[in-house]
């Protein structure tokens, strides 16, 4: 259930702050959110897949760290990002 290259480039284009920006927190959080959504759908059919569940927890933790960093640096960008991604915080 990996993210396709087309979907990843679309997310980068949508959330990038500059042209060719792949490292900003907004882009990283958007990609992580897409991966988390895919894994969540995977678990609806594979309830006992504990190895992937550990990976999901790692992704959620990484996303939380990036969101905390963004909130500390720029509250406006943080609010805009969680509203556009539909993340509840």
From Swiss-Prot:
SUPFAM superfamilies: S15/NS1 RNA-binding domain
GO cellular component term of the entry, any: cytosolic small ribosomal subunit
GO BP terms: translation
Family, similarity comment: Belongs to the universal ribosomal protein uS15 family.
Source organism of this protein record: Allorhizobium ampelinum (strain ATCC BAA-846 / DSM 112012 / S4) (Agrobacterium vitis (strain S4))
Subunit: Part of the 30S ribosomal subunit. Forms a bridge to the 50S subunit in the 70S ribosome, contacting the 23S rRNA.
NCBIfam families: S15_bact (TIGR00952)
InterPro entries per record: Ribosomal_uS15 (IPR000589), Ribosomal_uS15_bac-type (IPR005290), uS15_NS1_RNA-bd_sf (IPR009068)
Keywords, alphabetical: Ribonucleoprotein, Ribosomal protein, RNA-binding, rRNA-binding
Gene Ontology molecular function: any one: rRNA binding
Function: One of the primary rRNA binding proteins, it binds directly to 16S rRNA where it helps nucleate assembly of the platform of the 30S subunit by binding and bridging several RNA helices of the 16S rRNA.
UniProt name for this protein: Small ribosomal subunit protein uS15
CDD domains: Ribosomal_S15p_S13e (cd00353)
């Amino acid at each position: 259930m990996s993210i396709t290259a087309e979907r990843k480039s679309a997310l980068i284009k949508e959330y990038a702050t500059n042209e060719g920006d792949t490292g900003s927190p907004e882009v990283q959080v958007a990609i992580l959110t897409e991966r988390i959504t895919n894994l969540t759908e995977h678990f609806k059919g594979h309830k006992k897949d504990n190895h992937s569940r550990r990976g999901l927890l790692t992704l959620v933790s990484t996303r939380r760290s990036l969101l905390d960093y963004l909130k500390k640096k720029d509250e406006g960008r943080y609010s805009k990002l969680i509203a556009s991604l539909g993340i509840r915080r």
